[in-house]
Structures are given as C-alpha cells and as structure tokens.
Amino acid sequence: MKIIGDIVNAETIARGRGIREYALLITRYGGKNWIKRKGIATVEMDGVVSRAEVHWYECHGIGRVKMKVKQWL
C-alpha cells in the first residue's frame, strides 16, 4: 500500500490508554503519547489507485505506524 499525496480530514479517534493496542505500541516502537487517527487518502494498491479511509497510529518522534485501509470510497 502506498499513500499518494496528503491525507485530508484527519481526526483523532483515541489517545493514550484509550487505544486497545497501547501496550503493544510501546513495546514494539517505544514512545508514550500514542494517538490513533483516521483520514481520507488516495491509495495505490496492486497498481490500482483509489480513495480510501485509512487508520493509523502516530507518536511524536516516531511518526505514523500500522497504516491500514478501513473502507474504499
């Protein structure tokens, strides 16, 4: 999966201990202030380009991790 361009309408879904995978994120990537976010992006997957709702986790100093497509638009 490759994100083409910017992610628009990004919003926070959960932060800190409100994230189900919070302990896993700290163990695997480090950091403390994790945020789960969602937004709309143009995604290229298997040579097909389409708009999709994507979800990801991010932390200051680490960046975006575990990005996944939740819904094709």
Where do the language-model regions lie?
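Cysteine-centric segments in proteins
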Residues: M1-L73
